[in-house]
């Protein structure tokens, strides 16, 4: 029995028995964040961002007469309500992290996520007020150096959209780090394989962030041929990086399922995304397709982040081939 016990992985001292509550709360935050991104994306798709010109920190006003809302106003106000829910859930998540999460670096990521959620809420409010409030518009133009109101509106819309998807990827990463999977034994792989997976994961994330920025440009500033071409070329680059990452990941030991499985999901998602991208260009009047293109973009970035986090945590590189 002593020999058997010796080869069993010992309990990780960083794993609190109460960590399951942090994980469950993080899952709730990520779920509502995806809903938030979905409604926000559709608001942009149907150009409904200015249907409610008023914005303040009186968030409870957004829940009044919600059932009577229609059309774009319904999507805009639901987007704000979901943002409020995400904010309060994130506060709960960070509180549970402070109490039960023993790893300081994970707690810090939680604090960063909460800070970004607050920033996102303020950015969303500024995006509304630069159109409806002349004083905010003038201040924003002076602060950014953008000379026209439309340009300021586009700038804040792009930053709000891009940061939202990056924040979602971070939240998904936190759900993974607080799950039981994170504490499974590491997998030994060759140093070359580990470097390839990590490098390709970072390249994929970088390419996806650029794609998100370009997509936000097209969605907020209107379709421009040059930007569409660059966005299409970027899609090919992302597809190439994902293909290379999938090939390398599938070549890993089967024990590295925590890296192999999300690589398979990523390869499937990129095909779906290309399909939605083509249809968004060919049939721009189909608003749901354009919104789905936005949502799948968020999922691509999130899955890529999971692969990157796991590539550093799960894979243990060794000099000799294993």
Q: What do these predicted ranges mean?
A:
Residues 1-19, 179-197, 317-322:
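Membrane-interfacial, low-structure loops and terminal tails that flank and connect transmembrane helices
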Residues 21-49, 211:
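N-terminal signal-anchor transmembrane alpha helix
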Residues 22-26, 104-114, 196-204, 256-267, ...:
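Membrane-interfacial loop-to-transmembrane alpha-helix junctions, especially the N-terminal start
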Residues 44-77, 139-149:
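Extracytosolic (periplasmic/ER-lumenal) interhelical loops and adjacent juxtamembrane/interface segments
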Residues 76, 80, 223-240:
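A loop-to-helix transmembrane entry motif
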Residues 85-92, 162-179, 234-247, 298-311:
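Hydrophobic cores of alpha-helical transmembrane segments in multi-pass inner/ER membrane proteins
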Residues 148-160, 224-231, 286-296:
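Non-cytosolic membrane-interface motifs at loop->transmembrane helix junctions
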């Amino acid at each position: 029995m002593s020999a058997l016990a010796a080869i069993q992985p010992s309990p990780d001292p960083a794993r609190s028995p109460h960590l399951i509550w942090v994980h469950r709360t993080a899952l709730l935050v990520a779920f509502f964040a995806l809903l938030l991104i979905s409604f926000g994306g559709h608001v942009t798709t149907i150009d409904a961002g200015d249907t409610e010109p008023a914005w303040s920190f009186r968030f409870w006003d957004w829940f009044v007469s919600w059932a009577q809302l229609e059309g774009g106003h319904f999507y805009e106000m639901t987007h704000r309500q979901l943002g409020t829910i995400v904010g309060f859930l994130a506060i709960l998540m960070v509180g549970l992290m402070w109490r039960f999460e023993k790893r300081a670096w994970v707690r810090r990521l939680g604090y960063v996520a909460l800070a970004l959620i607050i920033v996102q809420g303020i950015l969303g409010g500024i995006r509304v007020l630069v159109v409806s409030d002349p004083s905010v518009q003038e201040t924003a133009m002076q602060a950014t150096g953008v000379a026209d109101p439309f340009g300021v509106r586009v700038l804040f819309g792009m930053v709000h959209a891009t940061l939202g998807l990056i924040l979602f990827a971070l939240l998904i990463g936190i759900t993974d780090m607080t799950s039981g999977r994170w504490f499974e034994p590491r997998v030994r792989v060759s140093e070359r394989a580990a470097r390839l997976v990590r490098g390709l994961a970072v390249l994929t994330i970088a390419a996806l962030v650029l794609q998100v920025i370009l997509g936000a440009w097209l969605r907020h500033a209107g379709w421009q041929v040059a930007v569409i071409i660059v966005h299409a070329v970027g899609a090919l680059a992302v597809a190439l990086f994902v293909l290379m990452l999938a090939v390398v990941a599938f070549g890993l030991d089967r024990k590295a399922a925590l890296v192999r499985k999300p690589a398979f999901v990523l390869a499937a998602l990129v095909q779906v995304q290309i399909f939605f991208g083509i249809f968004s260009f060919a049939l721009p009047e189909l608003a749901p397709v354009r919104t789905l293109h936005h949502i799948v973009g968020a999922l691509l970035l999130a899955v890529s982040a999971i692969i990157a986090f796991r590539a550093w945590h799960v894979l243990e590189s060794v000099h000799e081939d294993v």
